[in-house]
């Protein structure tokens, strides 16, 4: 987990009002792929761990995915910086596929066309329709799609918890992947989200489950 988190904010989780949300956990954001994210596999495995515990107590799981089609093209100014992104994450390609054992029947899946799922989809409306007031987030990549979506969720009035070790980053400019991840986590903790690691979340969730006899 990231060290010395600057925020002391914490939020409770309740299965009926909290959703566990993965952001862009797709092969195109993995190590050695279109977007070089060296710790992607570890982050996704931590999300799987969180989701297994969350599902056991009846919690809902949702997924944001960036998948482009001729009818669903990149929005905003993305193509100014990544001209080939529509092809890199085109429907039907391996890069656009979700990591295995992540999306299960009954999960909510929302497709986006820009970095922020709040700006480029009806994610917030769909969460509110389910009476969700708290969103627990993991995904790829920490400073881009995770951070912009977390910002939007928080500004929309939803409580956000980021699972730091269920997120990962690519290297950005002079920042290593680890440095870029850490900077994004610290920024989100500063004003936008509570931050914890997967182990803490799982312990909290297990405490919600009734004791077995």
What kind of region is each of these model predictions?
Residues 1-19, 49-52, 56-57, 83-213:
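Active-site-adjacent betaalpha module
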Residues 19-28:
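Acidic-leg catalytic submotif of subtilisin-like serine proteases
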Residues 24-25, 67, 140, 166:
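Active-site metal-binding loops of divalent metal-dependent hydrolases
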Residues 27-29, 168-169:
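A short, flexible beta-alpha/helix-coil linker loop
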Residues 28-31, 71-73:
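Short acidic/His/Gly/Ser-rich catalytic and metal-binding motifs that mark active-site loops
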Residues 29-39, 135-138:
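Surface-exposed cleft-lining segments at the edges of enzyme active sites
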Residues 72-88:
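Short, electropositive alpha-helical surface patch
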């Amino acid at each position: 987990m990231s060290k010395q988190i600057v925020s002391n904010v914490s939020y409770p989780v309740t299965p009926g009002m909290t959703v566990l949300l993965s952001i862009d956990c797709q092969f195109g954001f993995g190590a050695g792929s279109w977007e070089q994210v060296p710790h992607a596999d570890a982050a996704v495995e931590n999300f799987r761990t969180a989701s297994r515990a969350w599902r056991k107590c009846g919690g809902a799981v949702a997924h944001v995915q960036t998948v482009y089609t001729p009818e669903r093209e990149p929005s905003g100014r993305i193509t100014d910086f990544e001209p080939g992104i529509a092809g890199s994450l085109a429907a039907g390609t391996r890069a656009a596929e979700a990591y295995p054992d992540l999306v299960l029947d009954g999960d909510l899946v929302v497709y986006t066309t820009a970095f922020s799922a709040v700006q480029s989809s009806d994610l917030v409306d769909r969460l509110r329709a389910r009476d969700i007031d708290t969103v627990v987030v993991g995904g790829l990549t920490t400073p881009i799609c995770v951070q912009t979506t977390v910002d939007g969720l928080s500004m929309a009035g939803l409580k956000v918890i980021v699972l730091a070790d269920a997120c990962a980053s690519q290297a950005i400019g002079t920042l290593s992947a680890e440095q870029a991840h850490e900077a994004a986590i610290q920024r989100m903790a500063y004003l936008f989200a509570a931050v914890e690691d997967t182990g803490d979340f799982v312990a909290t969730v297990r405490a919600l489950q009734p004791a077995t006899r």
